Design a protein with these regions (language model features):
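FAD-binding core/adjacent interface of flavoenzyme oxidoreductases
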Residues: 1-13, 73-162
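Beta1-alpha1 glycine-rich phosphate/pyrophosphate-binding loop at the start
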Residues: 2-82, 88
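Hydrophobic/small residue at the entry helix of a nucleotide-binding pocket
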Residues: 19-20, 165-168
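Short helix-terminating capping/connector loops at secondary-structure junctions
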Residues: 33-34, 161-163
Length: 168
């Protein structure tokens, strides 16, 4: 990563904090100890073992905490990275090099300037337009909260049918 020519530190905003975003943030820190790095993640968790989610649903991985590779505190203490969870990038303004962020808990919208912007927002499950697709008991497994919802459904004694082609 190139340093700014006027001795100011470079500011990088990373959108997405799971696999790609978290890896990028850690690598950027190794490349530049002085960079200001901000990683924003729409969900409540960063850097988790998403390929382990089906195993957590099935009880092979019992503790949800076992899925968490790193926490926002880990990134702050070990890498000096500002991690903002429950924070969604809602608009990118390339002409002014700013990104608008919405706090999912408060609804507050803020603007963050950047020198470099990395987009690693992850994927979204395809939900076919089928009748009943939004009924209770229809789940997808992409995030830790998704896996938790399925486990809670099953623990209540509700029936559950799982099917997938390939996950990871």
């Amino acid at each position: 990563m190139e340093a700014k020519t006027n001795n100011a530190k470079i500011k990088v905003v990373i959108v997405g904090g799971v696999a790609g975003g978290a890896s990028c943030a850690a690598r950027l820190r190794r490349l530049d100890e002085n960079a200001e790095i901000i990683m924003v993640e729409k969900g409540p968790y960063v850097s988790y073992a998403n390929c382990g989610l089906p195993y957590h649903v099935g009880g092979v991985i019992e503790k949800e905490s076992s899925l968490l590779v790193a926490t926002p505190d880990t990134f702050r203490v070990m890498f000096n990275i500002d991690v903002r969870t429950n924070c969604e990038a809602i608009r990118i303004l390339p002409d002014t090099k700013t990104v608008e962020l919405r706090n999912a808990l408060t609804g507050e919208v803020t603007s963050e300037a950047y020198d470099k912007l990395v987009l690693s927002p992850g994927a979204k499950s395809v939900r076919p337009p089928l009748p009943g697709i939004d009924l209770p008991g229809i789940f997808q497994v992409r995030t830790v909260p998704d896996a938790r919802a399925i486990r809670e459904w099953v623990e209540r004694g509700s029936l559950f049918l799982a099917g997938m082609d390939k996950y990871c």
